[in-house]
Curated annotation (Swiss-Prot):
Top EC category: hydrolase
Pathway(s) this gene product operates in, as recorded in its UniProt entry: Cofactor biosynthesis; 7,8-dihydroneopterin triphosphate biosynthesis; 7,8-dihydroneopterin triphosphate from GTP: step 1/1
Protein name: GTP cyclohydrolase FolE2
Recorded superkingdom: Bacteria
Matches recorded under InterPro entries: GTP_cyclohydrolase_FolE2, GTP_cyclohydrolase_FolE2/MptA
Site description May be catalytically important, residues in chain: 154
Keywords: Hydrolase
Organism per entry: Burkholderia ambifaria (strain ATCC BAA-244 / DSM 16087 / CCUG 44356 / LMG 19182 / AMMD)
NCBIfam families: PRK13674.1-1
């Protein structure tokens, strides 16, 4: 077994000078699975598993970044995740990596306990959530993205049919840039309230009747869905910009109907 000479100094190759003089905009680690806890709107703590992407800007004269420091940051971040805690993580990463700019992104399943509309039975429904933050030129921007499954029912189908109307599951995806703390549940509520009907994990027969009739009484094209959600986001001062998408998985076609609205309130007329 080789014995290391106590006088030997292990070289730090990453910190050596790179003669090619080409900066790298983003370098780091991607798709790191790591457990985390999330602070919910009610103040409870929810355990989940996040998929993390962390990267920084690398100057032209530096050969490499310190990859292990990204994972060390996750190991040291044990407190429940909030928007402010996420902002602090981003600042800590820049200090640890001695970087002027960087980005952190984490995607995780988030569960909401929902009560059925008639029977009152409770069940969990999962949502895909992404929290992202980037710091550049002394400015920090935070983004909250939520994919919300809902039901949509076609107004045209209802109008032309003697009975019934085609309906389907849809995805509403809200990617919002935040001006202030905004609970995940707030974006979920906006999407669900503007859909033909929301979803539940568990329904009894009286609930299923309610859901069917609720959607029938509230038909919406994919265009209606994104416009109605956009109005809600426009009125929310906690959101400064957003990319909003709706996709209807059409039950009478082998393709989806799709719509997108993108708006930055800072540049609005």
């Amino acid at each position: 077994m080789n014995q290391m000479n106590p006088a030997f100094v292990m070289p730090d190759v990453q910190s050596t000078v790179d003669t090619r003089q080409i900066p790298i905009q983003r370098v780091g680690v991607k798709a790191v699975r790591h457990p985390l806890t999330v602070r919910t709107e009610s103040g409870d703590v929810q355990p989940t598993v996040g998929v993390w992407n962390l990267d920084v800007h690398l100057p032209a004269d530096q050969k490499g970044t310190h990859m292990s420091r990204f994972v060390a940051l996750l190991e040291d971040s044990r407190e429940p995740l909030t928007v402010e805690r996420f902002r602090a993580m981003l600042a800590s990463m820049l200090v640890r990596l001695e970087a002027e700019a960087g980005r952190i992104e984490v995607t995780f399943p988030y569960f909401v306990n929902k009560t059925a509309p008639v029977s009152g039975v409770q069940s969990l429904l999962d949502y895909e959530v992404t929290l992202a933050g980037e710091s550049r030129n002394g400015e920090t921007r935070l983004f909250l993205k939520v994919l919300v499954p809902v039901t949509s029912l076609c107004p045209c189908s209802k109008k032309i049919s003697q009975y019934g109307a085609h309906n389907q599951r849809s995805h509403v995806t809200i990617d919002a840039e935040l001006a202030a703390d905004l609970p995940v549940e707030a974006l979920i509520r906006i999407a669900e309230e503007e859909a033909s009907c929301e979803l539940w994990g568990l329904l009894k027969r009286p609930d299923e009747k309610f859901v069917t009739e609720r959607a029938y009484e509230n038909p919406k094209f994919v265009e209606d869905l994104v416009r109605d959600v956009a109005q809600r986001l426009d009125a929310d001062e906690r959101v400064v910009a957003y990319v909003l998408e709706a996709e209807n998985f059409e039950s009478i076609h082998n393709h989806s109907a799709y719509a997108l609205i993108e708006r930055d309130k800072r540049h609005a007329a």
